[in-house]
């Protein structure tokens, strides 16, 4: 759906410059967007874009974007209003704050028509109260779908648990209070799951938040101290703390393999 944008005001407020828009945009709401900059705001009418320079702050509801430079490209509609279609933020550190989460990078691009955002740069990071996600290449977010994708050496840490993979994909849903909560987490490629008790590896994994069960597939290995379980598929029930390993075509004879060393596991205190 094309988001309509109307220019409400463009004026100078020393020592900052301010511009206010009304559009469904950064946070998927109809609240107005306010852009302030320490140095200047430029309106390039021929090229059809706005540019804010130095210490830029974009605020819409509970969502805030901070950067050094921001450009907003727009198209003119038939009724002479302006539809912003692409927002680009750059700087040594670009920060997006939404509710209790913060994302960090060096460049962020938001495609308004697609409700799609991508963040790139060094030290990509997403921090929330109970977990942290890092990636080497990109952090992608689909606003309407509630999907987050971390690409390239992706790592998610929560308490004492860590999951690593080439790509991590998190899907969210709204709870009864209208707050987005985790629905599922997919790990794709070179998966390593580390807990205080064991290390699990495989080609891919899926965690279902509703059932609290994780499934690891292809070339699966569970290592606890010196003991090793190998199979084609593993299920880990985090409710009962019971893990099941299954054989398959990737295993010799389709059998599960386990190697155990007596006395290698410390007894619970």
Question: Which residues does each PLM region occupy?
Answer:
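General helical structural elements
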Residues: 7-8, 22
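N-terminal amphipathic/hydrophobic interface segments
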Residues: 20-269
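Positively charged n-region of N-terminal signal peptides that target proteins for export
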Residues: 1-4
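Bacterial N-terminal signal peptides
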Residues: 8-16
